[in-house]
Amino acid sequence: MLLAKVVGTLVSTRKEQTLENLKFLVLKQIDTDQKETGAYVIAADAVGAGVGEIVLYATGSSARQTVMTDRRPCDAVVMAIVDLWEIDEELKFHKYGHA
């Protein structure tokens, strides 16, 4: 799994039938210091994440192992909304800004 910040949404009115009713998010991969590290990623949203939230996402075959993405042509899926993380017993991120 990888860390990312949700930076936008993607709307598609015409798509492959198995992708109907999926919400898509635009993600930017980040490191544990919240610095952007990669390209943009389009991911199906399995958890109801919103713009500005930090999330965990998976790609490849792992992305197709959620109930929502099973048997669907998804290459990336948001699997969790991050509340906080600690490294070496130091709080590095808190969703509500306490870090």
Segments and roles (model prediction):
Residues 1-37:
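N-terminal first-folded block
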Residues 14-16, 44-46, 66-69:
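A generic local secondary-structure boundary/capping motif
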Residues 30, 44-46, 60, 82:
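A structural micro-motif recognizing beta-strand termini
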Residues 39-43:
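Short alpha-helix capping/helix-loop boundary micro-motifs
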Residues 62-99:
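C-terminal structural segments of small proteins and small subunits
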